[in-house]
Amino acid sequence: MASSLALKRFLSSGLLSSSFLRPVASSASRSFNTNAMRQYDQHSDDRNVDVYRHSFPRTRRDDLLLSDVFDPFSPPRSLSQVLNMVDLLTDNPVLSAASRRGWDARETEDALFLRLDMPGLGKEDVKISVEQNTLTIKGEEGAKESEEKEKSGRRFSSRIDLPEKLYKIDVIKAEMKNGVLKVTVPKMKEEERNNVINVKVD
């Protein structure tokens, strides 16, 4: 009885503010902004996307969303990471709509195909190289200009580690058209991978 009276006095005194009655936000969802959502942010007032853990458990693939594959400051990524990110964004409509990525990657039995949106850049602004199975793609507006001129244009950069003995890195093809770069990396055939040299013994 005494405890009941004490509770009534506590409630009537106003000490229990409305903030204590607010429901606690579930830890199963988070709102966040990432670099991969920059283009989405520019076209929407709602800058947050709720991601529910129970829908797709957090794995290493989810960490890839924290920076765009073709962000100038992103670290080198393996090909499997890039393809996994594509699968993750494609399979989940929420993430796919939120990212609006300016790139795509797909792999077939014959080749690897990469597409990068580089608005404002021409083929003279793009450099593609392969060193120790690492494919490097760089694009910089006004890359051919002289050193004296200030360069403050767009920049694109990415490094992708390709698996060894799987792709023909010496016959990579690239095409730049209307601000879109398409890169094709042919695959080796099975007999080409098994590069066995028999040495005759005299």
Swiss-Prot record:
Subcellular location: Mitochondrion
UniProt cross-references to Pfam families, sorted A to Z: HSP20
Keywords tagged on the record: Mitochondrion, Stress response, Transit peptide
Segments forming domain sHSP: 94-202
GO annotations of cellular component type: mitochondrion
Transit peptide (residue range): 1-31
Broad class of the protein's primary localization: mitochondrion
Protein family per UniProt: Belongs to the small heat shock protein (HSP20) family.
PANTHER family: 23.5 KDA HEAT SHOCK PROTEIN, MITOCHONDRIAL, SMALL HEAT SHOCK PROTEIN HSPF
Protein name as annotated: Heat shock 22 kDa protein, mitochondrial
